[in-house]
Amino acid sequence: LPGRSFITAVGIAMSVAVLVTSMQWIDAINRMVDVYFLDAQAQDVSIGFGEPRSSEVERDIARLPGVMTTEPMRAVAAKMRAGSREEREAVQGLPANQELYRVYDAQGHELRLPPEGLVISTMLAKLLEVGIGDRITVEVLEGRRPVFEVPVVDTFETYIGSPAYMDIRALDRL
């Protein structure tokens, strides 16, 4: 009987451990949703265009009734290559001091984009086998389809995906 009681106690302890672990996942998912949809995206409305537009369009939107602030964002489909490694990913161009669409790392720290170079997730850095200071060849898959080399200036840990960010002015110049 003592052995049977011990096994029962161990079984109950393991059941509680599984329950606590599963509850932690709910908290983690809630935290991720809060960061991605409440903290990072402070805008009420996003307007997307199929093709890049001039900054004049942003000024026109800013003049509409009820609009308090605007902020440009540009997502460019691209192939990124480093050596023999290649990944298809969007390069997202954001203002250096973004307010409406902010980027956070997995620790909750807000990332500030430097004036030049790419800031990529650690997952993308791992897939391309690159680090800070290495150069990546970026082949844009839209418009004139330019190909350019850009340095990796920072990496960050993220919850989801393998994003790449750049200052929007630097992206527009390329």
Question: Which residues does each PLM region occupy?
Answer:
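Alpha-helical transmembrane segments of bacterial inner-membrane membrane proteins
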Residues: L1-L174
